């Protein structure tokens, strides 16, 4: 994968870099003026760009494309800015399906806070130890807040058990499509992601946790994107470690 920044893009932003991430979370960052290509194994790749204008204290992160990389292919991403309309455009080589992507990079859009998550009923850095077959006493939920409005909520799952149930490794909870039935069947519940999405939504893992067996970890990672294309600064990760239910008999 190669990245190209036009002069208009370079003049509009004081600092910038592109990031290509694999579905496993490995990342390669293309810093300013980097012209070398990076090599990736075939599979899903996620392209993001980090930008900051002069005078801004924080950078903005945009998810620009998710695509399937094939063996022996070279992919070129070109970043440009139409200064008159304050629009950032990202175009792709013919190997990547889809038209160019456009983002509002006006001061109002750049100053809008990125989406963020709040955990309820669990601590992100601590594995959640559930009892196999029992619903947690407290609700285990994740709240997403996007001031500009929610565009998508991406759930990445690492669980051999759920994979065997045809549960998707990656799914947009705002548009689950064919996976909606299995998500519901296994107990995952959402509010605020259906139909006309607003600023807040909830992902409820409580009933899903009841159905998870012992024998390892089940990892769920959430990432949100707002209507401007900004992504949450930090993904929210829930790690569930079910324990067996043992009874002592006198």
Regions found by a protein language model. Give the residues of each.
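Extracytoplasmic cysteine-anchoring/structural motifs
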Residues: 1-249
């Amino acid at each position: 994968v190669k990245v190209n920044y036009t002069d208009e893009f370079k003049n509009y932003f004081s600092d910038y870099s592109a990031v290509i991430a694999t579905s496993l979370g490995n990342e390669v960052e293309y810093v300013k003026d980097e012209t070398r290509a990076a090599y990736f194994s075939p599979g899903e790749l996620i392209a993001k760009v980090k930008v900051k204008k002069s005078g801004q204290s924080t950078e903005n992160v945009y998810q620009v494309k998710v695509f399937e990389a094939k063996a022996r292919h070279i992919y070129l991403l070109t970043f440009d800015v139409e200064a008159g309309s304050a629009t950032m455009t990202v175009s792709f080589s013919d190997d990547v399906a889809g038209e160019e992507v456009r983002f509002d990079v006006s001061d109002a859009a750049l100053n809008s806070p990125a989406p963020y998550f709040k955990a309820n009923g669990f601590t992100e850095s601590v594995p959640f130890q559930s009892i196999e077959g029992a619903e947690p006493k407290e609700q285990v939920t994740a709240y997403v807040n996007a001031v500009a409005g929610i565009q998508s909520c991406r759930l990445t799952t690492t669980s051999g058990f759920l994979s065997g149930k045809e549960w998707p490794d990656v799914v947009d909870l705002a548009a689950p499509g064919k996976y909606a039935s299995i998500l519901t069947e296994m107990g995952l519940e959402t509010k605020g992601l259906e139909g006309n999405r607003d600023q807040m939504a909830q992902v409820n893992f409580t009933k899903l946790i009841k159905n998870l067996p012992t024998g390892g970890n089940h990892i769920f990672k959430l990432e949100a994107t707002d209507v401007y294309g900004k992504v949450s600064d930090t993904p929210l990760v829930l790690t569930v470690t079910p324990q067996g239910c043992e009874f002592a008999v006198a």
